[in-house]
Amino acid sequence: MLQVSRIVQRPRSLESLCGLNPTEFTLLAEHLEPLWTQAHRTSLLREGRKRRIGAGRQFKLNVPHRLLLTLIYLRHYLPMHLLGVLFEMDAANVCRNIHAFLPLLEQALPAPLRARTLDIRKVAPDDAVPRRRLRTLEDVLAAFSEIADIIVDGTEQPRGQPKKKRSGPGKKAVGRPKDQKQFSGVKKGTHDMKVLKQSRLLPRLPRGSRVWGDRGYTGVDKLCPQHEVIVPRMRPKGGKLSPEERELNHQIAKVRITVENVVCKLKKFRVCKEFYRNDTRRHGLFWGCVAGLVNLRTVNRAPQIA
């Protein structure tokens, strides 16, 4: 069975397996320990439980191993049977462990836009200078009140669909004010502008900030006149762009490449890239956990805000 104590001694192998370095993995496991204890106790004390506390089979995996199992699944999207071979467990047991652990993982991470599962309390050591941990869009806007540029984009992920094809690849609206990601899942064939409206991102942006987008966001300036909207110029029907307009589009693309890099970081976790084969009601949960992992890496590897 994979042993955490051995893998953390090989930083490159650990980062290749789960996307975190040993320090980030250890801190996250320590943060998850009390969350798992509380969730397990709540389950034991639930109404209708007949067996006494302590009875029954004990869990085979502790919190660090359960975290490693979940992160490997998010990173590589391996079949449950293969994960069962790696951790010497039945595939059904692997599935139960992962799906029970995902909500706690999202709660422990700086994940976006799912306020009902986020713990946004600011906790700092007694001997340290108080610091702000950026977990929500409001935290980012409060810490960076001078934010001037917001870049929005969309991405898709294929998933199963019924025979009548009422739905298909889910499109995600991705906003990037500093290092915070925001998501809104929709059905197949939905235009980028409609996704942006459904995400409810625009009313929450700082007044006077600039909004950057691709040609799919042409017309956003009519929705938010208090913002400066910058999108590439579209070629007129039957016409051509002038050299000045082509150069302007090139400069806009150099700014917009930032959000493309963010999408690339998200898609390194195969659960957000490959064919989605889980319950559609958990789609946002998976994306929230992955976005939280990307945020965690970004925050921990950037200067802290005092």
Predicted regions and their residues:
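Charged, often Cys/His-bearing segments associated with DNA-binding zinc-finger transcription factors
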Residues: 1-61, 302-303
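Short, amphipathic alpha-helical "recognition" segments used to contact nucleic acids or chromatin
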Residues: 62-77
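Short helix-loop boundary/capping segments at the starts of domains
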Residues: 30, 34-41, 75-79, 100-103, ...
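Short, flexible segments with low predicted structural confidence
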Residues: 1, 40, 54-56, 65-66, ...
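Short, well-ordered secondary-structure "scaffold" segments embedded in the functional core
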Residues: 80-306
